[in-house]
Amino acid sequence: FHDKMKVLVTEPGFEHAVRYVLRDINYELFCQELLTIDNKKDFQLLVMRSFLEGLTQKTTKGLTGNNLDVLDKAKSYTFMSNHRDIVLDASLLNLLLIRNGIKTSEIAIGNNLLIYDWISDLVRLNKSFIVKRDVGVRQMLDAARQLSGYIHFAITKKNESVWIAQREGRSKDSDDRTQESLIKMLGISGEGDLINNLKEINIVPVSISYEYDPCDYLKAHEFLLKRDNPDFKKSQRDDLHSMEIGLLGFK
C-alpha cells in the first residue's frame, strides 16, 4: 500500500486533479499526509471524502441520496447501478454512504480504463477490483466465473459491499435496462440455484441522476458514430477525455 502511495504522489496527472478541486491546497503538505496513510479505509475516509466533497461543492449545486436509512449497517450489499459517469457514479454513492455512517463499497472497474499506471494505482487504493473487458470468446466464461466468484466472496466472506454497473458501458440514450448477461454472471457462483445465488449477494438497485451531464455532447457523438459504423471502438484517449470532463464539468 505504502509503495503505491509513494508512486502516486509523484504523478503529474494526480497532482493536476487534486490542485483543480482543492485550489488552495499545499500539495507538498498534502503528499506528506498521504504518506502517513497505510490502509484503504483511511485513504477513503481522509482523502477521497475530502476530494469528493470539494468536487461536489465546485461542480454541483448539491448531492442528495434517498432511502439510505433502509440499509442495515451490519450487512454487505451488491449495489447495482445505472451508469452515467465513468468515475463518479460509484464515487458519489460511496460519498453518500460515508455521510450516513455506512461502510463504502468495492468498485468494479473495467481494465480498459486503466490507461496510465497511476490510474491503476489510484483505483486499487480506492477499493476497486478489475473486470476483464478485453478477453476473447473462449475466455469470457472463465472471466465471468472469476468475477462472480469474487463478488460472492466479497459479500459473504469479506463482508464488503460491491458496486457494479447494470450494463457494460455508460448508457448513451438513457435506456437503463439491466444487461441480462450481468444477472446470469452474478448467479453463476453459489451453492444454490440461480435465485438463491442472487439472494446471497443482497442486490440493491441504485438509480443515479445528474441534473446536467457534462459529457452529453461526447455521448451523442459516440452514439452517432456507432449508429453509422457498428464496429466503431473508442480509443483510450476518448475514455480519458470523458473521465476528465465528467469529473471537472458542472453537473
Predicted regions and their residues:
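Membrane-anchoring hydrophobic helices of lipid-metabolizing enzymes
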Residues: 1-77, 83-94, 98, 104, ...
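A short, conserved acidic/glycine-rich loop-to-beta-strand motif
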Residues: 105-109, 201-204
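Glycine- and acidic
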Residues: 76-77, 133, 168
